[in-house]
Amino acid sequence: MGITTINAKVFNTAELARRVDLIFTVDSGAGYSLVPENILQELGIEPHTTKSFFLANGDKIQRKMGIAGFEYLGEITAAPVIFGEEGDAALMGVTTLEGFGFVLDPFRRELRPMSMRL
């Protein structure tokens, strides 16, 4: 099974002009996107809560969370974001993908438009 990456922008929803380009690993098993904390701080995005998460190996970790804007292929969405710590890779999670209207095709390892439902 391969790894899917995308180039997307992250920004503070209160300051739309300043954006940072990142390479995200698309993780269809992750509910939320993760961006390194230093980038979120640079954009003025502040955490509003701390949540516990379980990793694939069973370890339990805690991470700060906030709200960030994301842009990909001209689509823009706002979504919860995890503040990544040192060593954490930028991840694009399902909540953000659905906000864009995309889903990961597991066979072709690419993003495809999804059928939107109310």
Question: Across the structure, where does each feature detected by a protein language model lie?
Answer:
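Pepsin/retropepsin-fold aspartyl endopeptidases
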Residues: 1-118
